[in-house]
Amino acid sequence: MVFDEIHHCAGHDPLLSNAWGQQILHRVQDRAAFTLALSGTPWRSDDKAIALARYSSPEGHLICDYRYGLKDAITDGVCRSPRIVLLDNQKVKLTEELGADSSVRLFPSIAKLLGESPVTYEELLRHDEVINPILDLGRSKLNELRQVKPDAAGLVVATEIEHAKQIALALEGMGEKCRIVTNKTPDAQQVINAFRSSACRWIVAVGMISEGTDIPRLQVCCYLSRIRTELHYRQVLGRVLRRTGKWDHQAWLFMLAEPTLQGFAERIADDLPDDLAVLREVQIPGFNPVSRSNPMGASVHVEGIEGAGLGGAELGFGLQAANIIWLGGVATEPIYQVSFSQHYRQQLLACF
């Protein structure tokens, strides 16, 4: 019996297994003479055991019978060498307005903004002055790559359907044609198949093309997804790593310098991270008051975009719940506006 992407199948115990894992435990585990289970990311974000996998005792480390890592694949000419570019800003202004009152704070980086203000990563992903410079970097790199490989293409991973439409409009404003494919797209697989052999330069995806989809001409990726798990991040990066010829030896991924994603990027050379491929005791998830990745009631709208460069755009955030400010016994919502200076900086992480 052969399994691909075995990490989707969870569980050693039927009570802690998912539906796919239960089928393996009930129908395969004691019947197959030999099993071959494959995965490029052999761990699960919920920390559950992978079905049929073996773990050391008492450490709980995954025991692999054979490893063929990214470095091996690059050496053999099977995969491209990843180049990851993180976009940051050295002067981010946050303006808080409440009625006639306003206050301004400056942050030296996006990490500081996210760590010390109510602004969330997902809200930043909808800011035109985050979307545009990341797309522009990807577009410039794709232009360069197509000088050598004329059919090279780019992938943009979006957060949800409206976000994908916003990104598509931005690409069109740059003179680029693109396709949009989401988990709601009728005949989505046909759209992907058509793009695979077309001359279209860009495809914008939501919930698609992150795993198991082979489009070898993809060589550039702009990561604008709100998902910040290492499994998803590596699966997306894998979409641009497939090498097809002598001259396409590099893959490029562009993203915001968000601390969690930066940590994933910095250890992409580690094929089996020790803190991930470990069997842990699984607990029922509880409320985490620190997490602000998807604030309830958050509304986002673009307010007057000024200028055409990298600065001048502002984004308003109506933050509710824990961010309500009380004045005279009446709750009112502060409005936060973020603006970026032209002092963008790029950090390049090169692997192998």
Regions picked out by a protein language model, each given a short descriptive name:
Residues 1-37, 41:
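SF2 helicase catalytic motif II
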Residues 124-126, 130, 141, 260-352:
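Long, largely alpha-helical accessory region at the distal end of helicase-like NTP-driven motors
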